[in-house]
C-alpha cells in the first residue's frame, strides 16, 4: 500500500 493510503487507514483506526 502507498504511504498515503496507510496514513488514511491509521486515521480511520
From Swiss-Prot:
The similarity comment for this entry is:
Belongs to the MCD family. Crabrolin subfamily.
| Residue numbers bearing the Leucine amide modification | 13
Hey, what tissues is this thing expressed in?
Expressed by the venom gland.
What is the designated name of this protein? Vespid chemotactic peptide M
Q: Which GO terms describe its cellular component?
A: extracellular region
Recorded superkingdom: Eukaryota
> Subcellular location, in the record's words?
Secreted
**Protein function:** Antimicrobial peptide with activities against Gram-negative bacteria, Gram-positive bacteria and the fungi C.albicans and C.parapsilosis. Exhibits little hemolytic activity against washed human erythrocytes. Mast cell degranulating peptide. Induces the chemotaxis of neutrophils. Its mast cell degranulation activity may be related to the activation of G-protein coupled receptors in mast cells as well as interaction with other proteins located in cell endosomal membranes in the mast cells.
Q: Which GO terms describe its molecular function?
A: toxin activity
Stretch forming the signal peptide? none
Q: Which GO terms describe its biological process?
A: chemotaxis; defense response to bacterium; defense response to fungus; killing of cells of another organism
What does the record's miscellaneous section state? The primary structure of this mature peptide is identical to that of Vespid chemotactic peptide 5h from Vespa magnifica (AC A0SPI1) and Vespid chemotactic peptide VT1 from Vespa tropica (AC P0DRA0).
Sorted keywords for this record are: Amidation, Antibiotic, Antimicrobial, Chemotaxis, Fungicide, G-protein coupled receptor impairing toxin, Mast cell degranulation, Secreted, Toxin
Per the record, the major location class is secreted
